C-alpha cells in the first residue's frame, strides 16, 4: 500500500536545499510514479534557474502551478514573443498560482530564494518537443541566457 506524502516544512527545506546545490538551481520531488496518468510534484526553485519560454502542444498537457513558498513571476507570451500577460505568484499573496492550457507559451522567473511550487499535469513524462520551445528565446545552456533571464526578471521590477 502506498503511504500518504505530506507537504510540510521538512519537505520544503529538503527540496530547497537540493535546488540550491543543483547546478540548474531547481529540484523536483515526485509524488507520482512515472507511469501514472497524473503527475504531481513539488519543485524547489532558486533565482539562478532558467526556465525558458515554452508551451505544451499535446491537448492533454495543460498544467497547474501553485506557489507553496516564496515568489515567482509568470510571463505569458504570444507566438512572436511579446508579453501578453504577467503575474507575480506568491504563497499567501493575491495570486498564488496559474492554470495553463495546452499551447500557451509561458516562462517562469524565480523572485525569491528557496521558492517552492506544486505542479500538476498529465503523465507520462514527455520532454519538451519540436515546436514547444520558443524560437525567440535562448535555450538552456545557450549564449544569451543571462541577458534574456535578466530581461524576464526586469518585467517584475
Where do the PLM segments sit?
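Glycine- and acidic-residue-biased ligand/ion/polar-headgroup-sensing regions
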Residues: 60-80
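Short beta-strand His + acidic residue motifs that chelate non-heme Fe in jelly-roll/DSBH
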Residues: 53, 74-76, 98-100, 106-111, ...
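A short, N-terminal "cap"/entry segment at the start of jelly-roll beta-barrel domains
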Residues: 1-39, 85-91, 145-157
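Conserved short histidine dyad/triad with adjacent acidic residue
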Residues: 25, 42-60
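Double-stranded beta-helix
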Residues: 82-83, 107-157
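His/acidic/aromatic-lined binding-pocket segments of jelly-roll/cupin-type domains
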Residues: 42-43, 62-67, 98, 108
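Short acidic-glycine-tyrosine-enriched beta hairpin
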Residues: 78-106
Amino acid at each position: 500500500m502506498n503511504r500518504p506524502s505530506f507537504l510540510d516544512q521538512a519537505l520544503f527545506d529538503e527540496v530547497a536545499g537540493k535546488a540550491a546545490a543543483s547546478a540548474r538551481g531547481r529540484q523536483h520531488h515526485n509524488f507520482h510514479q512515472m507511469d501514472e496518468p497524473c503527475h504531481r510534484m513539488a519543485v524547489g526553485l532558486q533565482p539562478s534557474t532558467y526556465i525558458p519560454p515554452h508551451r505544451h502542444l499535446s491537448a492533454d498537457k495543460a498544467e497547474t502551478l501553485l506557489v507553496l513558498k516564496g515568489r515567482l513571476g509568470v510571463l505569458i507570451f504570444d507566438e512572436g514573443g511579446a508579453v501578453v500577460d504577467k503575474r507575480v505568484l506568491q504563497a499567501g499573496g493575491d495570486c498564488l498560482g496559474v492554470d495553463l492550457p495546452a499551447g500557451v507559451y509561458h516562462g517562469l522567473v524565480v523572485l525569491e530564494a528557496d521558492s517552492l511550487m506544486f505542479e500538476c499535469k498529465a503523465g507520462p513524462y514527455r520532454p519538451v518537443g519540436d515546436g514547444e520551445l520558443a524560437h525567440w528565446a535562448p535555450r538552456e545552456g545557450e549564449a544569451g541566457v543571462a541577458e534574456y533571464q535578466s530581461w524576464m526578471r526586469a518585467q517584475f521590477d
